[in-house]
Amino acid sequence: MIEDAAIIEEFKRLTLEALTHDGHRGILAGIIDELVGILGNAADFQIDRQLDIAEGEIASSKGLAISPTQAAMCAGEFQRTAIFLRGLHDAITEAVELKSPEPVRVLYAGSGPYATLAVPLMTVFPPEKVRFTVLDIHPVSIASAKSVVHRLGLDRSVEAYMIADACEHTIPSDAIPDILLSETMSTALEREPQVAIMRHLLGQAPDAVIVPESVRVDAFLVDTSKEPDIVVPESEGPPTKWQPDRIPLGPVFELNASTIRSWASLSDDRLPAAAIHIPPPPEPTYRPFLFTTIVTHGEHILRTHDSNLTAIREITDIDNLSAGRSLQFHYRLGAAPCLVAEAED
C-alpha cells in the first residue's frame, strides 16, 4: 500500500518526465519502468509469474480480451506507454481549452489492472478539468484500478468504474465522453477488438476525439535477408551496418474517426479495405508484409518496431503468391478479427 506522500510526489514527477523527455531512449525506458513500478506497488492485483500469463483471457464475440496479467505486462513497453500518454495528454489539453469551464470526460475502455494511460494524467489535470470513466471486462482489473487510484489519492478524478464489455456498453446519456481512449489491439489490428470497440463507442459519442487518432496498416515487399536479426525501433533510425530493403505496395486499411463514420451503414461482418498489386520482386527473398503505424494524437506516433503493436506480419493468406497478381483486402469482424487478403484474377 502506498501511503508515503513522497512516493506520490515522485509519481507526479515521473509522469511529467514521461511526457517531456526528449533524450536517450534508455532514460525514457527507466522513467516508464519507475512509473509502472509505482502503479504495480499501489495495485491490489499482482502478477503471478508461476501462472500462465494467458490465464483469464476472454474470447468474446468481437475479439480476444487479454488477461489482466497480459495487460499489466503491456504497461512495461516503455515507448508504447509514453507515446499513448503523450497523445492522450495533448488530446485532453485541446479538449479542456474548448470545454472550459466544463470538465472534459474521458472514457477509458480496456483499462487493465493499472489504468496505465489514465492514472498518471490524473496528476496533471485536476478533477475540476478532467473526469475519467474506467471500464474493463475483467472484475479483477476494475478492483485493482480502483485500488491504484485510491492509494495515489486520485479518487476525485474518477467519475465511474464499470465492469463491462466495451463492445456492448451503453454510454449513459448524461455522461457522453469528449475523448474515447482504448488500446485493445495487436499487430495489424488482429485478434483484439479495437475496431469493434471504437466503432461501437463512437457511434454513441459521434463528436468525441478518439485515442489513438489513427491506426494505419500498409503493405510492403520485404527482403527478409536484409531485416535486422535484432529488432530496431524505426524511430531510432537504422544502424549503419544494415539498411532494410522494403518496397511499398500501398495502404491497406485505416482505423480513424472518418473511416468509422463511413462504415455507419454497414451491418455485415466485414469492412472495406484496399487492394494492392504485387510487382516482380528483385530477388526471391522478398515477401509481402503488413506494417502498422499508430498515431495516438497529433505528432505522437508509434512507428515500425517501436512496440509489439507495430511489429510486422507476413501476408500468408495466399499460397504461391506471384508477381503480377493483385490482392483485395477486407477487415473481418467477429471473434477472430483480422485483415483478410484474397487473390484477384
Task: Identify the role of each PLM range.
Residues 73-85, 110-117, 137-141, 190:
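Phosphate/oxyanion-binding active-site loops and adjacent basic polyanion-contact surfaces
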Residues 2-11, 15, 19-39, 52-61, ...:
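Class I SAM-binding transferase module
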